[in-house]
Swiss-Prot record:
Originating organism: Mycobacterium ulcerans (strain Agy99)
Official protein name in the record: Mycothiol acetyltransferase
Binding site for acetyl-CoA 2: 243-245, 250-256, 289-294
GO biological process, one term: mycothiol biosynthetic process
Keyword entries, A-Z: Acyltransferase, Repeat, Transferase
EC number annotated for this UniProt entry: 2.3.1.189
Domain called N-acetyltransferase: residue spans: 8-141, 152-320
Length: 320
């Protein structure tokens, strides 16, 4: 089985085929095979695409791999999907081998949900887990009241005039993080353009007026934020999309306060829908961030699934 050719551009029809492929795999597996960033990249030319098509006259996509380039110390990252009816034909193995060959074995692979086929492919190719991202969930019922510390202002996103402070806090809070750190204005603009974006769901915690002189703009300084999201394709599901606290403001309980304010908002916004079932909120946290995991457990969250990043332990030796 060959993996096809690398492409830096996908046609509109190819993008549609990949989205359809992801939808089918999600319905069968119960977990999306790729993250939302991969779907954003389909129309861009910032990543490499590997497309495997069947031999029917329409040549529909039965396999897809997205390879994002390395950034500084962060390895190149691949995410892939194979059509459920085309599995056990070596397609995933061929795509993984192609990605390893392209990067000299120095990339990682996300396995969303860490499903059995992904574990088997990783084992067969000598890939080992290097990172785990835990998805945690809880019901939006019986939420504790948020406690807002004295001298703290809470408001929602007012527009692009908030972007500079948002970027400052985000990049300070996630300086270590491969995906969330190093954001630019373009990253914010992309997410504002998403259909789910709602400025009323982005909460800002600012220092009281006595701290205004600490901000370059002369406005109250941003201490933290909670960006919530409602999943339009999964009624009743909300998300703690990004929760960031300025490292200089940690230890004041801002994370808990912002979390509860956001969850209360999700409850109200999802409560307007006739769902027929209980509303739920999800979030992602690195498995080795023990303090954060324990904090969320204390707020009633429990593990729903785990995404695993795999890589070669010794790329040079493995590819020699």
């Amino acid at each position: 089985m060959t993996a096809g050719q690398w492409r830096s551009h996908l046609t509109d029809d190819q993008q549609r085929q990949v989205r359809d492929l992801v939808t089918v795999a999600t319905q069968v597996d119960g977990v999306a095979p790729v993250g939302e960033q991969v779907l954003r990249e389909l129309a861009q030319q910032r990543t490499e695409h590997l497309l495997v098509e069947d031999q029917s006259p329409g040549k529909s996509a039965i396999g897809y791999l997205n390879l994002s380039p390395a950034h500084g110390a962060d390895a190149a990252m691949a995410e892939l999907v194979v059509h459920p009816q085309a599995r056990r034909r070596g397609i995933a193995t061929a795509m993984v081998r192609a990605a390893l060959a392209k990067t000299g074995g120095r990339n990682q692979f996300w396995a969303h949900g860490t499903l059995a086929p992904a574990r088997a492919t990783a084992s067969a190719l000598g890939l080992t887990p290097v990172r785990e991202l835990v998805q945690m969930r809880r019901s939006l019922r019986q939420l504790p009241e948020p406690v807002i510390p004295n001298g703290l202002q809470i408001r929602t996103y007012a527009g692009t005039e908030d972007d500079a402070e948002l970027l400052r806090v985000n990049n300070a809070a996630f300086a270590y993080h491969p995906e969330q750190g190093g954001w630019t204005e373009a990253d914010l603009a992309e997410r504002r353009g998403e259909p789910w974006f709602d400025p009323a769901g982005l909460f800002l915690a600012l220092e009281g007026s006595e701290g205004a002189e600490d901000s370059p703009s002369g406005q109250p300084r941003l201490l933290g934020f909670h960006w919530t999201k409602i999943h339009l394709d999964d009624p009743g599901l909300g998300e703690v999309y990004v929760l960031g606290v300025d490292p200089a403001a940690q230890g004041r309980g801002l994370g808990r306060t912002l979390t509860m304010i956001g969850l209360r908002s999700l409850t109200q916004r999802l409560g307007d829908r006739d769902l027929g079932h209980e509303s739920t909120v999800m979030l992602y946290v690195e498995s080795d961030n023990i303090a954060a995991v324990r904090t969320y457990q204390g707020l009633g969250f429990s593990t729903h699934s785990v995404d695993t990043a795999y890589a070669l332990a010794a790329p040079d030796a493995a590819l020699a």
